[in-house]
Swiss-Prot record:
Family under the similarity heading: Belongs to the thioesterase PaaI family.
Gene Ontology CC terms, in alphabetical order: cytosol
Record keywords, A-Z: Hydrolase
Enzyme class: hydrolase
Name under which the protein is recorded: Putative esterase HI_1161
EC number: 3.1.2.-
InterPro entries: HotDog_dom_sf, PAAI_dom, Thioestr_dom
Amino acid sequence: MLWKKTFTLENLNQLCSNSAVSHLGIEISAFGEDWIEATMPVDHRTMQPFGVLHGGVSVALAETIGSLAGSLCLEEGKTVVGLDINANHLRPVRSGKVTARATPINLGRNIQVWQIDIRTEENKLCCVSRLTLSVINL
């Protein structure tokens, strides 16, 4: 298994409470051997003035789940910080919720690269993002 830190969905969501993550309604929702997911509502908190999911909020979701994943696959005493993120917005989302899944592309000693795919409730890909993280000591 990829994960080196012990965690539950409950304690991950508790960790994210009282932050931008919880303000946007992001919830860590599932994980497997080499992936982790978070969901986010498409509502007044996450939409742009024209009635669709805000692209910057999609990027916040991607960075949230990718950074969390990056930290969880490191031994205690280490964490990650973002170096670069990009996103391609593929389709507008007007309602419901979206789910972001982070999977590793490369997990080096000093640099990690994560792929984050964001999908609609109908499982349509709406955003793809790539996140580069730097591993640091706490």
